[in-house]
Amino acid sequence: MTETVTVSELAEGLGAELVGKPTRVIRRVATLCDAGPDAIGFCSNANYLEDLRATGAGAVIVRAEHVAECPTTALVVDDPYYAYAAVATRLHPAERPPAGVHPTAVVAEGVTLGEAVSVGPHAVVEAGARLGARTIVGPGCHVGTGVEIGEDSHLMGRVTVADRCVVGCRVILHPGVVVGADGFGFAKGPGKAGWRKVPQLGRVILGDDVDLGANTTVDRGAIDDTVLEEGVKLDNQVHIGHNVRVGARTIIAGNTVVAGSTTIGCDCMIGGSSAITGHISIADGVILMGMTGVTGSIKQPGAYASPLPAKPVREWRRNSVRFTQLDDLFRRVKRLEAAQSTGEGDGGDDGD
């Protein structure tokens, strides 16, 4: 379902300056290349100015410095991409399933369902769970005993929220998400006694406006809770270990792993396939480039990176061999420096 609005209505909603025809009707969003007169696009990068000049869009969201390049009605804002997100949400609102419990769903006694809650096919909601108003539990989901879910949250297909976990308002859990599985806790016995499982007694607490991508997993705490504060966004296939705390508005890209008992600050940006060791802390405002390995605490905000860029195979092999020789080279350089220092000293004495 799409909504039809005029450009002036969109500009008012965005607080944007309007340059052009205010009565033009917009029905959809589109790329600059594919947009027609009923569509709105955006340009947030100077690399796309050629596409902007040639666009057939009815309107375009642009920065002030690009208005002269825009051949159609312009909505002028500081951040076109951020504004585009609001416009796309308005023009293409998500469709809601009907309120109520599907005949194939299982809802235990003692469950509290808020107004207009939807529980989809084959979903299971265990005893004592509380679902806030307008929350959607999708097909095949499992909501454990005593779980609390706030208003306007959406569990898509096959999501698991395990016993006693807490999910805030307006939270989105994409297909396959698991919240509250046991953390990885085992104690090694003497000799060949093997490993003894350590009970994981904490919960997972997700703040308001958290978004977890498909097949992402967040383990429950061993004793204390695992906490993702408000506004945290995780991409697909991210793993958060037990007792981790992720600060508000931090965003983590796909395939990243955060080991147990690590604290990540607020407003951090973590690139894909990064690996963060356990029992460390990362300050507010840290940016980790993709594939960064973090083995110790980061105490100052800023950008950090550790991946090796791709090289031709032959060059990479030579450098790999040289890397194994670094210790020997270091010792040789130290000996040469010591010898040079001694020689310079002897030369000075002879001169006297």
From Swiss-Prot:
Transmembrane segments: none annotated. GO terms for biological process: lipid A biosynthetic process. One of its GO terms (cellular component) is membrane. Pathway: Bacterial outer membrane biogenesis; LPS lipid A biosynthesis. It catalyses: a UDP-3-O-[(3R)-3-hydroxyacyl]-alpha-D-glucosamine + a (3R)-hydroxyacyl-[ACP] = a UDP-2-N,3-O-bis[(3R)-3-hydroxyacyl]-alpha-D-glucosamine + holo-[ACP] + H(+). Homotrimer. This is UDP-3-O-acylglucosamine N-acyltransferase. It comes from Alkalilimnicola ehrlichii (strain ATCC BAA-1101 / DSM 17681 / MLHE-1). The lineage of its organism: Bacteria, Pseudomonadati, Pseudomonadota, Gammaproteobacteria, Chromatiales. The gene is lpxD.
